[in-house]
Every structure is written in C-alpha cells, then in structure tokens.
C-alpha cells in the first residue's frame, strides 16, 4: 500500500481482493439516498455500474468520445440533473479521460467523483496519474491488467482522511482496531475483502513501478 501510494502520488491506498470490491466500497461510502443519480459511461464493464445500482442509485448513461472511448466533461454535463450525486469516470484501454475538465465540472456542481482506473494504471493526464484526481480511485491487479497478482487483486485510493481512517474496518468485517475512537466494536461493512498476503508478496517483486 505504501509503495503504491508513492508510485501514483496519493496519501491513502487500500489493497483489496479485487477491483469490484473497491467499487462496492466506493459506492457504499457515497451514501446514496432515494432518488440520487450516478453518471456512468455507456461503454464500460459491468463492475463499474452495478455496485452503485445495488446501493440504490439511479444510473444515467453518459456517451463516450468516439476517438478515446472515454467520457468527457461535455458528455457528462448533458446527464447532470438536480438529483445527480456521483460521477463515475472509467479510463479504458490505457486512455485517460480529461480529468482536469471533469473535476472542474464536478466541483462546480458539488459532485463526488469515482475513477475506475482498472485498465489504466500508470496512465498520466497532464502529469498526474489517473485514479488520483477524484474522491475515490479503483485499480485492478487481475491477470489481464497492467500489474498482476496471482490472478486477482485490487486497490482503492481515497482523498478524505476520515474515510481513510475507517476503510480498514470496512474491508475487514467491520472490525475496529483497539485504538479506534468508537461507540461500538463493530461497524457496518462489506465483509472481508482484504487482499490475500500471498498476492501482495507476489505483486511487487514481479512488477516494475
């Protein structure tokens, strides 16, 4: 996790059993209420979408740019309504979306940004790694991806320090550490989605970041 943070240039990263778990956690932390909408590219993998649907959000599908196969600030803006809460940006095939423009739009509208960078680890936009612009970044170490473990693995990056403080327990059965300021010993969690230690040991010696 520390090496990953150093590589992509962010303060908080959490190793998971796969990237879908990262999207599930991000969707959980967005805290959707009835009627909330999430904007998702019309061209993506199912894991980019169904975690948000499971949490009760209504999906608005954004068009992609025909040349880069990723969304743009313009295609996203067409989908924004007074119910929009989250934008999911998917960086595909090594193409990074124009994140400075998308982040400017998100900040103007007060929207959460989740970056699905499962197919774009190491891609830079204006000198900054994708997955580090938004509130959440999700990466995959599946055997078909840029960096691999022994079959599956993922990483979730977060900007918010408070969220970073609770993520270790959210990914591990809601189990609070003994030094955690808590009202109860257990918190609502996804289950156990930690990256297996064996995968972590395999990841770094066999990849070159």
Where are these regions (language model features)?
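Active-site nucleotide-sugar/metal-binding loop of Leloir-type enzymes
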Residues: 79-81, 129-134
